[in-house]
């Protein structure tokens, strides 16, 4: 559909992108309606898709999309996880309406449900996986543009774009090329300058890998922050070994105070010496009590009952 115009011809850089992403690699099986898009069959059974016909059908699809006045009337659907990121990016750049994930049956036919929609054009990633919206579109006369592999059924498909719709990079590149051509035909971007959006933005990313990349980035930032805080301490001679005296490593002589002299009574070394007035005779009578406390009273006087009750 280039019409013989040089500006619409397939460029070498686009061919390199096709081959790098594996757009030309089809399936082992081939539908009878897709035989016209097969260039040849390899010895291992893989069908090779003619990328020139892929480009022609891509231009035809872009011309159809441009004819829709309201971009939101174009509905893009992908139930396969590999194409959900691609359709979301395509919708953000072209203004289409994306349906990523499971398609609710009756969205195009049941007017009672809240998710009812009436699009004017439908774009699907795989007519085999997205068979439900393709079938409902045939009931309400909605044109269908589909990315088809060599084994994809073409029933109810109006425009089939032959490509590898099972590859992560392939389906992302096809939506990137379609979005670029739509914007160029609308006049939003110039054909003389390359599009500033890279195809990598349309590629599927595993959530676990994305989380690992974020954790690695945070770890690098933390290491850089730690290196920045410890950079000013290198002039002190490096890190000191564990167990070393911090005062000694800093070159400061420790000041230890003199021990406190306890005032303890002197003890005589002669244990045989006896204090004055002491006796070694254990059989001697005890000393008489002092008379300072009053008159001494004998035991007999204490035991004698008193008769003076007055």
Swiss-Prot record:
Main location: cytoplasm
InterPro entries in UniProt: Ribosomal_uS2, Ribosomal_uS2_C, Ribosomal_uS2_CS, Ribosomal_uS2_euk, Ribosomal_uS2_euk/arc, Ribosomal_uS2_flav_dom_sf
Location in the cell: Cytoplasm
GO cellular component labels: cytosolic small ribosomal subunit
Biased segments, Polar residues type: 297-310
Gene3D superfamilies tied to this protein: Glucose-6-phosphate isomerase like protein, domain 1 (3.40.50.10490)
Biased composition (Low complexity): 216-227
PROSITE patterns assigned: RIBOSOMAL_S2_1, RIBOSOMAL_S2_2
BP term (GO), one: ribosomal small subunit assembly
Keywords of this entry: Cytoplasm, Ribonucleoprotein, Ribosomal protein
Molecular functions per Gene Ontology: structural constituent of ribosome
Domain of life: Eukaryota
Pfam families: 40S_SA_C, Ribosomal_S2
Region (Disordered): 213-240, 271-310
Coiled coil: none
HAMAP family in the record: Ribosomal_S2_euk (MF_03015)
The protein's assembly and partners: Component of the small ribosomal subunit. Mature ribosomes consist of a small (40S) and a large (60S) subunit. The 40S subunit contains about 33 different proteins and 1 molecule of RNA (18S). The 60S subunit contains about 49 different proteins and 3 molecules of RNA (28S, 5.8S and 5S). Interacts with ribosomal protein S21.
Biological role: Required for the assembly and/or stability of the 40S ribosomal subunit. Required for the processing of the 20S rRNA-precursor to mature 18S rRNA in a late step of the maturation of 40S ribosomal subunits.
Family membership noted in the UniProt record: Belongs to the universal ribosomal protein uS2 family.
Protein name according to UniProt: Small ribosomal subunit protein uS2
Taxonomic path: Eukaryota, Metazoa, Cnidaria, Anthozoa, Hexacorallia
